[in-house]
């Protein structure tokens, strides 16, 4: 038969095992933040890249790279690493720019380049912008000729003479 000391030991062992297993049962209740690291880039940004761009132009479009080779400044690394807090999925993307002199010569990585990448920026056509708005009109040219803003009196008109 089980005595009092054995039953107390058995009861404490059961309580300990139940309390430790509770940590894993309620794991889905614990908030885990998403962890983004590096350069997040939209595909539209990468599509703006053109061959023979200068380093300044590439940096203006993509931002500063995560890593520049300290011995050869002709290779720039843009790395994006994202770990989801909910399902622990990991997204990893890289974009590597190679420059010859000060001009962009090669792009490698996980992003798709524009079909116009091999057309230098000086030779590419700018998109047409259709504007339906007309140029601003001066009051004499507007149909109603009323001022758009109510004019206040100037300080000279408001001040009273000093006695």
From Swiss-Prot:
GO-annotated biological processes: Gram-negative-bacterium-type cell outer membrane assembly; protein insertion into membrane
Protein topology in the membrane: Lipid-anchor
Region of interest called Disordered, as start-end residue ranges on this chain: 122-163
GO molecular function: protein-macromolecule adaptor activity
Signal peptide: 1-22
Lipidated positions per record (S-diacylglycerol cysteine): 23
GO cellular component: Bam protein complex
Keywords linked to the UniProt accession: Cell outer membrane, Lipoprotein, Membrane, Palmitate, Signal
Composition skew (Basic and acidic residues), residue ranges: 142-153
Main location: membrane
Function: Part of the outer membrane protein assembly complex, which is involved in assembly and insertion of beta-barrel proteins into the outer membrane.
Family note: Belongs to the BamE family.
Description of how the protein assembles with itself and partners: Part of the Bam complex.
This protein's name: Outer membrane protein assembly factor BamE
Species: Shewanella oneidensis (strain ATCC 700550 / JCM 31522 / CIP 106686 / LMG 19005 / NCIMB 14063 / MR-1)
Gene name of the record: bamE
């Amino acid at each position: 038969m089980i005595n009092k000391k054995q039953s107390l030991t058995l009861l404490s062992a059961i309580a300990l095992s139940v309390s430790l297993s509770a940590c894993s049962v309620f794991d889905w209740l614990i908030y885990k933040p998403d962890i983004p690291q590096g350069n997040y880039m939209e595909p539209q940004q990468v599509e703006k890249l053109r061959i023979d761009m200068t380093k300044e132009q590439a940096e203006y479009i993509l931002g500063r790279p995560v890593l520049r080779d300290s011995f050869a400044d002709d290779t720039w690394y843009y790395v994006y690493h994202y770990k989801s807090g909910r399902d622990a999925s990991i997204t990893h993307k890289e974009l590597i720019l190679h420059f010859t002199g000060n001009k962009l010569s090669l792009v490698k990585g996980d992003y798709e380049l524009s079909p116009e990448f091999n057309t230098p920026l000086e030779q590419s056509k700018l998109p047409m912008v259709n504007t339906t708005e007309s140029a601003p009109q001066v009051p004499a040219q507007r149909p109603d000729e009323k001022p758009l803003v109510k004019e206040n009196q100037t300080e000279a008109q408001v001040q009273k003479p000093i006695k």
